[in-house]
Amino acid sequence: HQEVYPVLTPMAVDSSRPFPLIRNKSLNIAALLQNDKTGDEYEFATVQVPSVLPRLVRIPSKHEKDITFILLEQIIEKNIDKLFLNYKVVCASPYRVMRNADLTIEEDEAADLLTEIEKQIRKRQWGEAIRLEVEDGIKDRLLNYLVDNLGIGNEDIFNISGPLDLTFLMKMYGIEGFDNLRNKPFKPQPVV
């Protein structure tokens, strides 16, 4: 709580706050909220999983040899109700948006090609949404809200059974005490 809570930025969507721009390849938690006062209105909210914290969180154990991890997004999802006071969290689920990263540079029209390339690279984070990864079992109402607001077709939705964005697994490779599970380094034969 002390490490994660201060770096979270929950964003709720309502009539005065439009659907936020979701950064390319960022991991987020979507939530459907019910107002405690009205009881019948549903609101959408999203929280980006902070990249400044490690995605794998080691859970302390009584036994030194027992090593257990939990994913940061699971911690956030299970405690998301603490971010939205006066709301009941109806459902929550992780998602990730992939955006079009193509560069469209008119070389003939660009006065300064380097400046134009830099500008286009900055825009890549906010291109058109072309893929939506969601955790298998996401509630239909939550999925439909994401699809409608991102402008994604059904063929661009990928239900993932397991964690989204597996790049974090490389961090597990360096964990001490598991040398027997690692492949031996490959040594190429010298050139004769």
Where are these regions (language model features)?
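N-terminal localization/anchoring segments of enzymes in phospholipid and broader phosphate metabolism
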Residues: 1-192
